[in-house]
Structures are given as C-alpha cells and as structure tokens.
Amino acid sequence: MKLPHFFVLAALVLSGAAHAERIKDIAAIQGVRANQLFGYGLVVGLDGTGDQTTQTPFTTQSIANMLTQMGVNLPPGINMQLKNVAAVMVTADLPPFAQAGQAIDVTVSSIGNAKSLRGGTLVMAPLKGADGLVYAMAQGSLVVSGAGASANGSKVQVNHLSVGRIPAGATVERTVATALGESGSINLELRQSDFTTASRVVDVVNARFGADTARALNARVVAVKTPLGASERVAFLGAIEGLEVSPGQAMAKVIINARTGSVVMNQTVTLDPSAVSHGNLSVVISTAPVISQPAPFGRGETVVAAESQIEIRQQPGEVMMLKGGASLADVVKALNSIGATPQDLLAILQALKASGALRAELEVI
C-alpha cells in the first residue's frame, strides 16, 4: 500500500524557499511575557450534574466555609447531599502590561466527579500567582462547548463537559511591573536559536538605525540600544518589530511521533542512494467456542470451552532501491515508493539514519 498522502502536509508547508519575516514573528522582547494565575472555586447552578458530595468531601467543606463567611452557620455534623455544586480549578494568563480593571479570559476545570459544568456559574474566586499574591478575581457564567444526555444506561456525549471558559471572566486587581529598556537597552530573544538569523537581525537593525545599535550576544539573544524616553522607546521598539529579516535555513530534521505514526520533515532533509527491504509480519489468533455434550443418561455436565488457532503470516520481503534526493520532494517521492505502513516507515527511517543515508537529525517524540 502506497502512502502518497503521508508526507503531503510536510511537502506543501515546508518545501518553499525561505522568505522575509517580521522580527516580531521570529523574536520576542526579553521580559515581556504572560504570567500564569490559578485559583480554587465553586461552580453553582448545575442541573444535577455536580459533584457527589459523599465522594468529594472538599466540595462540602468549601460550601460550609463559604456559607460561614456569609453568616450562615450550619449545625455540626450535618450531611449535605448536593448535586448542583462542583469544586473547580480556575486558571488564566495575565498578559504583559495588564492594568488593574482589565478583563481577562479564564478556564474552569472540574477537580471532583462532576458530570458536567454546563449551565453553571463560577462564584468569586481569587487568582494567585507563583508568589502567592492575588492578581485577579474571577466570576461569571461558564461557556461549555460540549453536550451530553443519558437515560436507561445509554449515554451520548459530544466534546468535553468538565471544562469550560468564561470570556472576560476575571478582573485584574494587581499589575506586574515590567522593566522595558529603562536601562537603555533591551534583549531580543529569537524563538529558534540560529547564528545566521541572529546575525541578520543585527545587520537589519544597524542598517536602519545606525551602526552599533544592535549586537548579537549568542545564537538566541540580540542586544539593542534603546532611547531613554518612554514614548520614544515604544515607537523605537515598534519600528524594530516591523523590520523584515530572512531567517537562516533550518537544520535538517525529521520528527517522528511514535504514538500516532506521524512523520514530519523540513525542506533541508536529503537522502543518499540506499536499498531498503521490508516485509509484513502478522499474527492472527482466532477463537471458536466448542461445546462438550455428555452422553445420554450420563451424569456429566455440558461444558463450553474455547478453542484457539494461531497463524503467523509473513509476506515476502522485497529489496527496493531508493534514489538519492537533494530536495524535499525527492525524499518524499523515494519514501512513498516503498509503500510501507506508518509504523514500518518509522523503523525504516531509523535504519536509514543509522546507515548514514538519511542526512538529517532524527527526533522521536
């Protein structure tokens, strides 16, 4: 079986020639990043799909604590049987330069055994950072994209029901200070380390703003001198982000996903002439019930046993010649000519790499 579609995506996306890209697409300003927030909360208003409180004692404890804070005191030892409440973990990303009062999206995930969060409302939940300080407060109605129904032992479910989103569901209460070029310089961090790309970024910036404006510290970091004034600095960084650079050619690499059988390679992969032989080996196990019937008027019992037959099938191997290829299209054509299954192809690529015929780094994920 040939697999001409197996490498179609890699061939179409990765075979084009290198083109100019904006600096903002290939690099980020050091220190300008999002910060993760997390918190614990309760979702109420569920239609009988909440936590089973007998199996999730933390949900019951959380409800009791919340009611106590509201002035509602429950008798000691009371056993609350609730079905419309779920304990959840609330997560969000605090974007750079976020200001107090700004709204951010939050994700709400069940941590108990709730069947669905659909239709629920998150009660006010503080969101903390890694330093333990509260940076935002989250509250609002959940949006759950899934749907499900069950009756008489039958169940139908579409998508995931135990995770929901609240667009603009949290309000920022505390800002994170970001020092942006206040010392007279900033660092640009390339998303992919490459000496050629770093050198080209330096050349483009210096050509636009003058010599010695930028200098490369290593294959990833480029230091850039900035104006001291805040307004001038913002305009300067905006101009730098808009400059176009032709990234260096990526290192030849083949990525293999051993779990799904997916193979992706970039345009710099080449293949030397080589010979490949592979054959399919399959083991077929079939089981049929055999009934042992006792003789008439005998005291034996009818017994049902299983009889298994095991058969090993092996198709004869065939030696095929792979022509050397200097382009991605040639490599794809050569590998498709083998006609191997995805799992066989994983082993063939590893063998080609071991033999030195595959001119690329092989990475298994």
Swiss-Prot record:
Residues 1-20 form the signal peptide. The keyword Signal applies. It is found in: Periplasm; Bacterial flagellum basal body. Its main location: periplasm. GO terms for molecular function: structural molecule activity. GO terms for biological process: bacterial-type flagellum-dependent cell motility. Disulfide bonds: none annotated. It holds the Pfam family FlgI. Transmembrane segments: none annotated. Keywords: Bacterial flagellum, Periplasm, Signal. One of its GO terms (cellular component) is bacterial-type flagellum basal body, distal rod, P ring. The keyword Signal applies. The basal body constitutes a major portion of the flagellar organelle and consists of four rings (L,P,S, and M) mounted on a central rod. Assembles around the rod to form the L-ring and probably protects the motor/basal body from shearing forces during rotation. HAMAP family: FlgI. NCBIfam families: PRK05303.1 (NF003676). Belongs to the FlgI family. This is Flagellar P-ring protein. It comes from Thiobacillus denitrificans (strain ATCC 25259 / T1).
